Curated annotation (Swiss-Prot):
Protein name: Ribosome maturation factor RimP
One GO cellular component term noted in the UniProt record for this chain: cytosol
Keywords, ordered alphabetically: Cytoplasm, Ribosome biogenesis
Family stated for the protein in its record: Belongs to the RimP family.
Annotated stretches, region: Disordered: 179-203
Record's keyword annotation contains Ion transport: no
Keyword Cytoplasm: yes
GO biological process, alphabetically ordered: ribosomal small subunit assembly; translation
Highest rank taxon of the organism: Bacteria
Purpose of the protein: Required for maturation of 30S ribosomal subunits.
Length: 203
């Protein structure tokens, strides 16, 4: 579910079409600011919303202020690149504690934690898997199932995968952030959507 940006050696989520083009344009700038792109979606038709989910390069959660910085940087690039005709919205959020696993490095970084995954293409007759993250190798995510067996999931076939919120995950996230985990709820920092109005001459 991840792809390598050859020009900048940045691992991106597996995306296609417009979403891939936008991700490839903004990812290097986000990396320069110390952030990584976790997920990108373009939703809606009349006024599409570009949803950016990001975190820090060390995997720690970002704040509302970080979201604003990312929004400003990405918005400036998209204003020039103009990938979407007409008006569009830009929304930025953190990955959250129970974050999506969209790249090989996510499966490696969160080895030992619980996760759930769903495939586009069935593997041995099943699409849904849950268990302990064991890492990634050769373009596959490895997850140890409840019966002790390991499932090898092709990253490109993963429709969605996410960490399961547990006490251990909360403690690990708090330690990474250098704060107490007391009262942590796994919520995401989110910046209010910004509207990019139609430019003169746009229809």
């Amino acid at each position: 579910m991840s792809q390598q940006n050859a020009s900048s050696d940045i691992e991106l989520p597996h995306l296609t079409g417009l979403e891939a083009r936008i991700a490839e344009r903004i990812a290097p700038t986000l990396a320069d600011l110390g952030y990584e792109l976790v997920r990108l979606s373009v939703l809606g038709r009349d006024t599409p919303t570009i949803q950016i989910m990001a975190d820090r390069a060390n995997g720690s959660l970002i704040s509302v202020e970080d979201c604003e910085q990312i929004s400003h940087a990405a918005g400036a690039i998209l204003d020039v690149d103009d990938p979407i005709p007409g008006a569009w919205m830009l929304e930025v959020s953190s990955a959250g504690i129970d974050r999506p696993l969209t790249r090989a490095k996510d499966w490696e970084r969160f080895a030992g934690h619980l996760a759930k995954a769903e495939l586009d293409v069935p593997l041995n007759g099943r699409r849904r898997f849950s268990g302990t993250v064991m890492g990634a190798r050769d373009g596959n995510a490895i997850i140890r199932l409840d019966d002790g067996t390991e499932a090898v999931l092709p990253l490109v076939d993963i429709r969605k995968a996410r960490l399961v919120l547990t006490d251990a995950l909360i403690e690990a996230s708090a330690a990474l952030a250098g704060v107490s985990s007391e009262g942590e709820d796994g919520g995401e920092a989110r910046q209010a959507p910004k509207l990019n109005p139609k430019k003169p001459g746009k229809k």
